[in-house]
A protein has these predicted regions:
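A beta-hairpin/wing motif
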Residues: 372-374
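Aliphatic-rich helix starts adjacent to a transmembrane/signal segment
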Residues: 2-65, 69-73, 369, 381-382
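N-terminal pilin/flagellin-like segments and related low-complexity appendage regions
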Residues: 57-314, 320-367, 376, 381-382
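Amphipathic, heptad-repeat alpha-helices with coiled-coil/zipper character that mediate oligomerization
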Residues: 28, 318-319
Length: 382
């Protein structure tokens, strides 16, 4: 006869060894899953940062390409603080740089197509420019928007405008949909819907940490673009009061410019521009990299800024945060060697002389992307 006691006596429980083995297997499975999840998350973060860095560099280059290519559009004299189409500002004109370069240039701002909320900046009818009659635009809102783009006023100071890229003049009065320009001896008639462009002196500048003026909105270093309000140490500066500069690309660490010029070497074609980039004294025969000038103030004839015909732009962007790697460590070396960008060796100073060791995050812990492009100034061709 089978009793309840016999049944209980015939049952065997889990031994301590079996329990420990089961716990160990479970721990291994959980640890493996955690490792896969952690490494996947870190790999995804690294990939996202890399993509963001590449996008920032491309955006910065696209802005510069458009403005440099159009530099000098409709220009027949100084515009704002730009005395020439291109105003170079090398970090150190006497030797290797210890920080990013800057550039200022004359660029057109226009709105030839228009929208319902931003009417086109075009002539409302056939107009005799310089006859003493005002220029009638498509609407008063177009004049208001143009004044806003100019900093709030078209007359204080007098804004420079280009009508169809053919006639450049200044605004002496603005009211309603009308602009008044100076009278000239021989007025020129322009057709209805001819676009009107506002010419501005635009500055490109990198704002390093800690960004006391807040231009980078917490994402310094960044590249800013706009009308600088004043001059610091002899160059236009977007951090001065009254500046109208905004960030166009985050985490841009360096920007370097080198220029090709025509008519800037007295020994080449007697210093007369001939449509060919001058061969610099230390370069080989023909056009090569040595014909791009990096260290110069462009203020002593014949090497002056009005002779610039090509600009070689190099932009360096960096990741915002350091990668963690696949373990739990927060530090790894991904940039083992300091970059040499044109005449700027980063180990001598990234933003200023001697700051290489104090850059945050550490220089060696962040990836960088470098992009170089050569741009022709099409409005300065001969």
């Amino acid at each position: 006869m089978v009793t309840q006691g016999n049944i209980r006596g015939g049952q065997h429980g889990v031994t301590l060894i079996e329990l420990l083995v089961g716990a160990l297997v479970a721990a291994i499975v959980i640890a493996a899953g955690f490792a896969v999840l952690t490494s996947s998350s870190k790999a995804l973060t690294t990939n996202e940062q890399t993509i963001e860095t590449q996008q920032n560099v491309r955006v910065a280059m696209e802005f510069l390409f458009q403005d440099i290519r159009q530099a000098g559009f409709g220009m027949n004299g100084p515009v704002g603080n730009c005395s020439t189409a291109i105003v170079p500002a090398d970090n150190t004109t006497a030797g290797p740089d210890r920080g990013p370069d800057r550039i200022s240039l004359v660029a057109p701002v226009g709105n030839p197509m228009g929208t319902a909320t931003d009417p086109a900046w075009v002539l409302a009818n056939d107009t005799s420019i310089g006859s003493g009659l005002p220029l009638a635009l498509s609407s008063a809102l177009a004049v208001t928007n143009m004044a806003s783009e100019a900093g709030g006023s078209l007359t204080a100071p007098n804004a420079t405008i280009s009508i169809g890229g053919a006639i450049t003049t200044t605004v002496t009065a603005a009211g309603g949909a009308n602009l008044t320009v100076p009278t000239v001896l021989n007025p020129t008639t322009m057709k209805q819907n001819t676009p009107i462009y506002l010419l501005q002196c635009i500055t490109y500048q990198i704002i390093p940490p800690p960004d006391p003026t807040g231009l980078c909105a917490g994402r310094s270093p960044c590249l800013v673009r706009g009308v600088a309000g004043g001059i610091t140490a002899g160059v236009l500066d977007c951090t001065t009061p009254g500046s109208r500069c905004t960030s166009i690309a985050d985490e841009i660490e360096d920007i370097q410019f080198a220029y090709g010029c025509d008519g800037c070497v007295a020994a080449v074609n007697s210093g007369t521009p001939d449509g060919i980039i001058d061969s610099q004294p230390l370069s080989a025969a023909g056009f090569d990299q040595a014909d791009f000038v990096t260290n110069n103030a462009w203020a002593t004839a014949p090497l002056t800024a009005d002779k610039i015909r090509l600009a070689q732009v190099t932009i360096v962007g960096r990741q915002r945060r350091a990668d963690q790697g696949f373990g739990e460590s927060n530090r790894q070396t991904v940039q083992g060697t300091a970059l040499q960008v044109s005449d700027h060796l980063h180990s001598d100073g990234v933003f200023a002389a001697g700051d290489f060791a104090t850059v945050t995050p550490p220089y060696t812990s962040t990836r960088r992307r470098l992009l170089t492009r050569t741009i022709e100034l099409r409005n300065l061709r001969h």
